[in-house]
Amino acid sequence: MQVKANDTTTARGREAEDRAARHLERGGLRVVERNFRIRGGEIDLICRDGKGLVFVEVRQRSRSDFGGAGASITAGKRRRIVLAAQHYLLGKPDCDCRFDCVLIDGEQLEWIKHAFSADD
């Protein structure tokens, strides 16, 4: 059986999200949803931090030829994450939230709290 490149990419992404989720849970967050999708946007992990929500983008790069994992989070990507978060928050008035990123470059993992805001 031949493995398609897309299947491999999906598996790597899932592994990165699993690794990020474990790290976030060790840091005190509780993962409440994974891969929340709407038309035009997606959030990798949605976590609970006390009474607030944390929307987490997970980016992985095995090589830095085109910049590290953080370089791949463009303004357009941030807008799509914010759009998905706004949709998720419908019906949840007065819910505090923030946007974090987990960057995985090779074996190194970095958790950036408050990585961007809805106004960026």
UniProtKB/Swiss-Prot annotation:
Source taxon at top rank: Bacteria
GO molecular function: nucleic acid binding
Region entry Disordered, spans: 1-20
Gene3D superfamilies found in the cross-reference section: 3.40.1350.10
Family classification: Belongs to the UPF0102 family.
Protein name: UPF0102 protein Daro_0503
Species annotation: Dechloromonas aromatica (strain RCB)
Organism taxonomic ancestry: Bacteria, Pseudomonadati, Pseudomonadota, Betaproteobacteria, Rhodocyclales
